């Protein structure tokens, strides 16, 4: 079995005007995360080279904020061109919030392979975690991404206080979108966040992966944020549960597993690493 590894570069961090209750990048909460408007492009290229060295196939360019404006779009396209010039064989993923058809067309022209815009949770539960934009705006952005020919990376976050009915509704919406890959994140409590929820139990987290694979049999199920914190020593059981992709290295504002540990463990388990999209 091949495992797809993806790395993340937080190319514009913090200061987001949205009020998502689970997110430390929101300007509505005081957190000690690293904040910057633009990361130096040379630094991003170095990170892309490291991602490639760490067996990553996907490299995700993430910007904080509600969505794209002209300036941000131009910057993301410049980054995409620079990475492609210096690093071969990486599939570029853009994660830049709410976007329209024209913006997504520009990203595709710049060499972006896939657009990541998570629904996060069910349509019904979403107003409990965010009031500054709607679930429908997220869903529509995904439809636009598909329309322009971008592959779709769409998932969400569990452990926000949602019910089992919410989880089923959320996965039904994902099934409707039929994404190429679907990230599963697990909420990590933070004293500065307005949302107060305990960590999910490892068994519950593994069952979420199983249920997601059942509902999205054709998608790469990617276990992302919270993997190490929630599952701890059981984190490599995710592959038996149906996952076929993980984030390698650090996340947006939290530390990830050491890439060398992930790579060594996966090799010991008999896995190889995806080097092309299939």
UniProtKB/Swiss-Prot annotation:
The Enzyme Commission number assigned here is 2.8.1.6
Q: What's noted on cofactor binding? A: Binds 1 [4Fe-4S] cluster. The cluster is coordinated with 3 cysteines and an exchangeable S-adenosyl-L-methionine. Binds 1 [2Fe-2S] cluster. The cluster is coordinated with 3 cysteines and 1 arginine.
Q: Where is the Radical SAM core domain?
A: 1-227
| UniProt KW Ubl conjugation keyword | no
Q: Which cofactor does it need?
A: [4Fe-4S] cluster; [2Fe-2S] cluster
**Under which pathway is this protein filed?**
Cofactor biosynthesis; biotin biosynthesis; biotin from 7,8-diaminononanoate: step 2/2
The residues listed in the UniProt record as binding [4Fe-4S] cluster, with positions renumbered to this chain, are 16, 20, 23
The record's subunit annotation is: Homodimer.
State what this protein does.
Answer: Catalyzes the conversion of dethiobiotin (DTB) to biotin by the insertion of a sulfur atom into dethiobiotin via a radical-based mechanism.
The record's family statement is: Belongs to the radical SAM superfamily. Biotin synthase family.
The protein in question is named: Biotin synthase
UniProt source species? Campylobacter lari (strain RM2100 / D67 / ATCC BAA-1060)
